Structures are given as structure tokens and as C-alpha cells.
A protein has these predicted regions:
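Non-catalytic macromolecular-recognition regions in eukaryotic signaling proteins
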Residues: 4-179
Length: 179
């Protein structure tokens, strides 16, 4: 609902942009200390790697439309196989950010993917000396961006009158859902 002054100008109310906007879709981070910054070897320190996924955009992402792979190291060094680190899916559907009835922004879903798959643990094997490993999450997902603009279509697009309801020429504002 919007209110108008006597002049007909809007004085607040509903947002004029149909989208929240932004430049992010799914944000991807490791949970704190996951993987841990340091472990002891010889199977004496088991651990998981937890990837946090948050939908910062305006499109819903189904569980089956997102795959997470853990890469950057040989899983055999931690008692696992490459299959234990491939094509993991999040626990939940990633619902988008939305605008509430009062105009407030409702945050999108945050969900998690745990490695290795199947609820098991990484168990560091025996290493010679200190060894650094790179853990990286590669995430592939289907996403969409929508846009909207108002066009001006008149009965006579050649002989445009000064008092026409709209102007078909010139630049138009394009609204985008971002990402």
C-alpha cells in the first residue's frame, strides 16, 4: 500500500524496485576450524570438513541442483577415496532471500555439506615431517537471474504526441535480481 500527496507523488510505502538486487548467488565458506588448521598424523586425530552454503540471491536452489566437491589433496593421505569427496549435496533446499510484508529482508537458507560423505571421518596417515595440504570446495549449481523493465507501446509509434502516456524512445531502467 502506498500513500499519495495531493500532488499525486508517492510518499513511501512499497518498494519501487521489484528485486532485492545484489551480486551474490550462493556464498561458500568452510565452517570455523573445519578443516582444522593443524592435525597430528598417524590416525591419532580424526576430523570432518564442513562447507557452509548460504543463498544470498533471489532464486531457489533445489538439493539436486547443487554439487560440492572437496579438492586440492590426495584423499588417500587421509584414509579416503576420491569418491568420498565427490558430488556431495546439501542437507536442505536453499530458499532465496525475500522481502517480507513490511518490506524487511528475509535471509535465505543456510545449509551444510559434510565431508567425507557418509558420516565418516578423515584420519591422517603417517607423514614424513610437517606437510601442508590445500582443502578447496568446488561448488557447481543451477542458478537464474531475472530482469524487468517497463516498455512503452503506443497505437501509433511513428507520430508520437507530446501528451502520450509514455515515451517509447530513450533509456529505460532495468531492474535485476542480481547474481
Amino acid at each position: 500500500v502506498s500513500a499519495c500527496k495531493k500532488s499525486g507523488a508517492a510518499t513511501g510505502g512499497a518498494p519501487r524496485d521489484p528485486f532485492l538486487g545484489g551480486t551474490s548467488g550462493i556464498t561458500i565458506n568452510f565452517e570455523k576450524d573445519s578443516p582444522p588448521p593443524e592435525v597430528t598424523d598417524d590416525k591419532s586425530f580424526s576430523f570432518n570438513v564442513i562447507v557452509r552454503l548460504k543463498n544470498e540471491g533471489e532464486a531457489k536452489v533445489e538439493r539436486n541442483d547443487i554439487k560440492v566437491n572437496l579438492v586440492g589433496f590426495d584423499p588417500n593421505d587421509f584414509g579416503k577415496t576420491f569418491e568420498d569427496l565427490r558430488d556431495a549435496q546439501p542437507e536442505d533446499i536453499l530458499e532465496p532471500r525475500t522481502r517480507g510484508a513490511e518490506g524487511d529482508v528475509q535471509e535465505g537458507t543456510t545449509t551444510f555439506v559434510t565431508f567425507p560423505k557418509g558420516g565418516d571421518f578423515f584420519e591422517p596417515q603417517k607423514f614424513i615431517g610437517n606437510t601442508e595440504f590445500t582443502f578447496r570446495a568446488d561448488v557447481c549449481y543451477h542458478y537464474k537471474t531475472r530482469s524487468q523493465t517497463q516498455l512503452c507501446v503506443l497505437r501509433d509509434m511513428i507520430n508520437i504526441k507530446d501528451n502520450s502516456i509514455c515515451q517509447p524512445t530513450g533509456s529505460k531502467t532495468v531492474h535485476s535480481s542480481g547474481a
